[in-house]
Amino acid sequence: MDERFVDLRSTKNPKARIKMLSGHFATKNSHVNTYIDMSTVKTRHNNARETARTLAEEYLTNTMVDTIVCLKNTEVIGAFMAETLADSSNMSMSAGNNISVVTPEFDFTGQILFRENSQRMIEGKQVLILTDSMATGTLTMQAIESVLY
């Protein structure tokens, strides 16, 4: 692991942490000056669980969630978020719900689509879209449009 990475811990939950690296990084669509390494949060269950608990706090008492749409390999975080939001022991608006966690597919042009077996989990539901980062917002806007369609 590069020694220049710095641990960034949540003030709400010190167990929820990510690594970041300052510098100049370019993608085909954007330039950023901080790289945030989300790989451990997305793949290690302890990191994902703590991150999900911290993220879910923002939605517990004010947002009903029926479905979580996971973008960019955030399914593990999404599953733990669903568990936290549906937990009947907290004051969640979604307590007791069987929250669906789905991942969209992409066609050959890059359009987001939901197969028939997932559409019933989207249509007429309260949907939370989860992503690991948002440099331009293009993918998130595509996801919003697909959910609303």
Task: Identify what each model region corresponds to.
Residues M1-Y149:
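PRPP-associated nucleotide enzymes
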